[in-house]
């Protein structure tokens, strides 16, 4: 009876049922509907790894077919698969630039050389550079896609750090005590020196200490998240590019440490935290907004994290995505068992 009377009342008393309310109700109805998602089924022998989000509806993965490695995109809404890049050499790494419509693909035939290919989203080659090592740590500048920071390791794990400029196709050596630096903004690097987090201006070599007694850090674009220990607590702080603290928070349980972190915007980040002291580690996906924990969801396992829009790919194989707000989990990749 109620459902019949409501539209009658709304029709008679227009002020009680405005067009804006109707729009809001329609938006809520759409939001509550589960969006259709296609599933990719692949052989364990063929698929090599999932690279992450290409955009909010498509995921990149690498497979092997007809003696070639292939970089493919899979559209979750349509199920369409597109080939973006193929190579007779092994594809071992793929990165998606956060602001430019570009992809980075690393290939190698053996341990003596690797080639870094820069492509657009259609798969067109834009640049490539050869490095005399296949063990590389590659940091792509989030602001300027023409700049790469490359650490090349040798067999004895000594290393050389180089800055690659795609504008003039040059490699310039960078001397640092840490083989795993990251970009902070367009022209600065951040790295660990003993227990200090240090930033350095590339043009002058000027150094600034950002934090002491640090455990680890994660930088993106022009901000850096630093994890440090203060007594029995873990302190997290987000700093801007000039070293000013934007916000911070404490975690009482120091057994949980940051495993992965992704900045969604200037004020929001997603973290996976894991209790490594347990025989079977417990992991959570945590949403932090302006230094406040606003959402915590238990994960079946730790592993990698890649977020785009309202979804995060999770797990060691990135075969599942989770809705950040609702906690809905969908396994988009099914691996067929070996016969």
Describe the predicted segments one by one:
Residues 55, 60-66, 104-111, 149-155, ...:
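Beta-strand C-termini and the immediately following turn/loop, strongest in propeller blades
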Residues 18-20:
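Bacterial signal peptide processing site
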Residues 45-52, 90-96, 134-141, 175-187, ...:
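Repeated scaffold domains used in trafficking and secretory/extracellular systems
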Residues 26-38, 67-83, 111-128, 156-174, ...:
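Surface-exposed loop/turn elements that mediate protein-protein interactions on large endomembrane-trafficking
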Residues 37-72, 88-94:
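Beta-strand-rich domains and repeat architectures in extracellular enzymes and scaffolds
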Residues 82-107, 114, 125-134:
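Blade-loop segments of beta-propeller domains
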Residues 124-141, 145-147, 152, 177-178:
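Asp-box/WD-like beta-propeller blade repeats and closely related beta-sheet repeat scaffolds
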Residues 13-16:
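C-terminal motif of bacterial Sec signal peptides marking the signal peptidase cleavage site
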């Amino acid at each position: 009876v109620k459902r019949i009377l409501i539209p009658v009342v709304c029709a008679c008393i227009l002020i009680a049922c405005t067009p804006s309310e109707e729009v809001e109700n329609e938006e809520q109805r759409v939001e509550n509907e589960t969006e259709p998602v296609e599933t990719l089924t692949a052989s364990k022998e063929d698929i090599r790894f999932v690279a992450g989000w290409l955009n909010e509806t498509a995921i990149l993965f690498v497979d092997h077919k007809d003696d070639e490695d292939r970089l493919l995109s899979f559209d979750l809404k349509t199920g369409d698969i597109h080939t973006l890049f193929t190579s007779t050499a092994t594809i071992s790494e793929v990165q998606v630039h956060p602001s430019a419509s570009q992809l980075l693909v690393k290939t190698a035939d053996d341990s003596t050389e690797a080639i870094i290919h820069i492509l657009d989203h259609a798969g067109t080659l834009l640049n490539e550079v050869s490095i005399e090592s296949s063990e590389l740590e590659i940091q792509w500048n989030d602001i300027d896609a023409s700049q790469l920071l490359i650490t090349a390791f040798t067999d004895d794990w000594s290393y050389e750090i180089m800055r690659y400029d795609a504008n003039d196709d040059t490699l310039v050596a960078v001397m640092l005590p840490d083989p795993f630096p990251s970009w902070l903004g367009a022209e600065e690097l951040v790295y660990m020196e003993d227990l200090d987090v240090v930033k350095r201006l590339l043009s002058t070599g000027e150094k600034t200490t950002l934090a002491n007694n640090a455990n680890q850090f994660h930088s993106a674009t022009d901000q850096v998240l630093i994890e440090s220990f203060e007594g029995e607590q873990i302190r997290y702080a987000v700093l801007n590019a000039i070293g000013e603290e934007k916000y911070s928070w404490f975690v009482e349980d120091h057994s949980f440490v940051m495993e992965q972190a992704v900045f969604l915007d200037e004020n929001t980040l997603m973290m996976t935290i894991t209790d490594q002291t347990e025989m079977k580690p417990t992991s959570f996906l945590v949403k932090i907004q302006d230094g406040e924990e606003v959402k915590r969801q238990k994960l079946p396992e730790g592993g990698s994290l890649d977020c785009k829009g309202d979804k995060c790919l999770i797990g060691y194989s990135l075969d599942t995505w989770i809705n950040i707000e609702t906690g809905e989990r969908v396994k988009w990749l099914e691996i067929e068992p070996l016969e």
